[in-house]
Amino acid sequence: MFVVIFGRPGCPYCVRAKNLAEKLKGEVANFDYRYVDIIAEGISKADLSKSVGKEVETVPQIFIDEKPIGGCTDFEALMKEQFHVVA
């Protein structure tokens, strides 16, 4: 499983998602992630909206194996369900 987290500095939900991904990387086989700082990379919410397929108002926006799954709480719920790991 490969997770991409699109976030920005100063976003507490981005930090939570990144911390959970880091924990999973250490505990779950075949799990890896990449954190993308949308400010540093020059990615706009309009750019993210194109990838997600609907208008994006918040970050983080998280993709699992290239499929958009939503934000931090969606990610936490999926990881708890699939791996029984909580943040």
Model-found features: residue ranges?
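Local sequence-structure signature of Cys/Sec-based thiol-disulfide redox active-site neighborhoods
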Residues: 1-34
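Thioredoxin-like thiol-disulfide oxidoreductase module
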Residues: 36-56, 83
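Structural micro-motif
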Residues: 52-63, 72-73
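Short, glycine/charged-enriched secondary-structure capping and boundary segments
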Residues: 19-21, 50, 76-79
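Residues at alpha-helix caps and immediate loop-helix transition turns in enzyme cores, especially N-
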Residues: 16-17, 44, 74
